[in-house]
């Protein structure tokens, strides 16, 4: 059986990841593909428990953040992502390991080598086939996020933190342009989704 493909959507707060996960899933299903939609932290009972701690606990040290996320990622990979890919399903995930580099690495100051070690140990070479990095100015994203709901623990960080996160993401995209495609999310949704559709269709055609 041909393994499925793994698509991730990344970006800072308020860039539209959840909306566009739904869009990507719908586009793939319209092609007759079996698709698993999931998120990080989350995707499993363990992961959702970590998500609650991660977003609601008043204080979580950077090292604890990183280790919690990778603990949740172990369950997510073994219970959801890897079995789906082996079945030939496609997986669409709202955030994955790139978020650890952007938030805990660039944002919190944890050395990339520490994250490299955890990634290589836990993922054993598994990488997304395509990552859609939704990018918007920090102020725009935070305004959208705060309009959506009350701020969670992460969203209460200052704009300097999110500027570091954004630059961390863009640095990843510069380092891996073949996998990570930057999508300008500071424009009408229809235009954002046209750009996303182009990248997804390219993967479907085997060109990514």
From Swiss-Prot:
Record key words, sorted: ATP-binding, Kinase, Nucleotide biosynthesis, Nucleotide-binding, Transferase
One GO process term, biological-process aspect: dUDP biosynthetic process
Residues that, per the record, bind ATP: 11-18
A GO CC annotation given for this chain: cytosol
Enzyme Commission no: 2.7.4.9
Record keyword DNA repair present: no
Role of this protein: Phosphorylation of dTMP to form dTDP in both de novo and salvage pathways of dTTP synthesis.
Protein name, UniProt field: Thymidylate kinase
Organism: Methylococcus capsulatus (strain ATCC 33009 / NCIMB 11132 / Bath)
């Amino acid at each position: 059986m041909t393994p499925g493909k793994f698509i991730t959507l990344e970006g800072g707060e308020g860039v539209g990841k959840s909306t566009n996960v739904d869009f990507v899933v719908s586009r793939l299903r319209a092609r007759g593909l079996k698709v698993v939609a999931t998120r990080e932290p989350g995707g499993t009972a363990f992961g959702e428990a970590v998500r609650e701690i991660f977003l609601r606990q008043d204080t979580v040290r950077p090292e604890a953040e990183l280790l919690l996320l990778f603990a949740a990622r172990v369950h997510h990979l073994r219970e959801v992502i890897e079995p789906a890919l082996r079945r030939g399903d496609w997986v669409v995930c709202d955030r994955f390991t790139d978020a650890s580099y952007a938030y805990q690495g660039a944002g919190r100051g944890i050395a990339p080598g520490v994250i490299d070690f955890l990634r290589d140990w836990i993922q054993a070479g598994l990488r997304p086939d395509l990552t859609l990095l939704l990018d918007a100015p920090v102020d725009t994203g935070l305004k959208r996020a705060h309009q959506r709901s009350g701020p969670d623990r992460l969203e209460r960080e200052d704009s300097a933190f999110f500027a570091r996160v954004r630059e961390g993401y863009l640095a990843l995209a510069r380092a891996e342009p073949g996998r990570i495609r930057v999508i300008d999310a500071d424009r009408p949704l229809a235009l954002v989704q046209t750009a996303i559709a182009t990248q997804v269709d390219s993967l479907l055609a085997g060109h990514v």
